[in-house]
Amino acid sequence: MRINHNISALKAGNHLGRTNTALTKSLEKLSSGYRINRASDDAAGMAISRKMRTQIAGLEQASRNAADGISVIQTAEGALAEVGSMLQRMRTLSVQAANGSNTNDDRKAIQEEIDNLTQEIQRVSETTEFNTKTLLNGDIDRKSYSDTSTVRIVDMSDTVANADYRISVTANASQATVTGVTSTFWSSSASTISPAQAGKLNINGTEIEINAGDTRDVVFEKIRNACEINNINASMGADQLTLTTKEYGTSSKINIICDSNLTAVLGLPASANQSGTDAKVTLLAPAANNAFTSTATVSSDGKKVTVTDHGNFEMVFEVNADEPPSTPPITPPYTVNFTVLDAGPMQLQIGANKGQTMDVRIPRVDPETLGIENVNLVTEAGAQKGISLYDAAVTKVTAIRAKLGAYQNRLEHSISNLDVTHENMSEARSRIEDVDMAKEMANYTQKNVLAQAGTSMLAQANQRPQTILSLLQG
C-alpha cells in the first residue's frame, strides 16, 4: 500500500470532473432548449444552423416585402378602377352628345362635365400614392430620353425593347388657320354694322347672325362663341381677324361660309376650307444604334406619331412637344435619338438572397397617355370621335388593370412559396439546433447519478490511506 500517491482518489476525481462537465452541459441544454449552445458543441452543425437562421430571417422579411408589393398594386388598381368608371361615364356622355336632338347649349353642358372628369383623371394620376411614392404618373415605369425637347415618347408597350432608337422628323404638325384681310372695322371699338352689311356667317356648321347696329365687340363675341363651340381660337388683331384650331393635324378643320355683304367688313373670304397637317416622321434604316426594324410602320394624328411592329410593338411620340418652342426654334428636317432603359420600375425584394427580385411597372395613366386630353363634344362629329377615343381609353385602362392583377397573383404565389420554404427550413434548423428533451433528461439523470456516485467514491478513496494507521498502531 502507498500513501504518497492516492491513485484511486485521482481516478475518482478525474471521473467526477468529467461527469460534472457533462452534467453542466446537459443542464445548459435542458435550460436553453438548444443542442448547440456554442461552436464546440457541434462545429459543423453550428455553421449550418447559423446560415439557416440568416435564411429564415430573410424569408420572413421577403414575405413581408411581397405583401407590401400587393398593397402597392391594390392601391394603383383601385385608382384605375375609378378611372375606368369615369371613362365609362365619359363614353356615355359622348353617346348622348352624338344625338341630333341636342342643342348647342346641351352639348356645352355635357362638355362641362367632360372637362371636369378629365381634370379629375389628371388629379388621380398625380396624387395616387403609396408611402409617398406616386404610382400613376410614370415614375415607376421604364424611362425614355431624347436628345431634343421637341420630341418625346408619350407611351410605349411592354414589348418595346431597352435600346436606342432614331427617327427623322420631316414635318411638324400644324393647326388649321384662316387669317382675314385687313379691315377698318376691326380697328375701332366704335365700328358698327350698317343695315347693308348685316348677314350670316357660318363657322364649321355653327351659324351666326350679324345684325345691323352690332358693334365691333359684339360681332367679335358672337364669332368667338361660335369658334369656342368648334374648338377654335379667335383673335382680333389691330385690323384683322384670325381663326386657329386648338388641335393639330388633318382632323382639325375650319370651314367658313360668309354672306357676300359681310366679307368686306369682316375681312373674311366668302368661303374657306382649311385643314391642319399631321407631323411626319421617317424611321431611319436599321443599324447598330437604331432598334427599329424594317417592318415597323408609322401613322400620324396631329402631333402624335405611332410606330407599330410585330409582337404588339407600339411606341407613341409627340412632335412639337416643346410649347412654347425652343429658342431658336428647331425646324425640320432633323434627327432625334431616343434611349429606352429600365431606370424606373419598382424592384421588389421577394427572396432572401441577392438578385431575388421582381420588377413592377405601372405606366403613366393620364388624359394625354389615354388620348382624351382634347375631346370636344360640342359638335356631332366631335361626339362621334369621342366615342372612339373613350373606347380606346377604356381598353387601355383595362389592359393595365389586367397586368396589375397578374402581378398580384404572382406575388400571392410568391408569399405562399416563401412561407412553405420558411416552414421547412425552420423544421430543418430545429432538427440541428434543438435538443431532444427526453433523451437529454435521460442523459442528465445518468450524469447526476454518476456525479453522486463519484462524489461518494472520491470520499471513500480519500479515506483509504487512513487504514495505514491501523497497521502502525497494531
Model regions: which residues?
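Primary detection of the long, small/polar-rich alpha-helical "axial" segments characteristic
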Residues: M1-G474
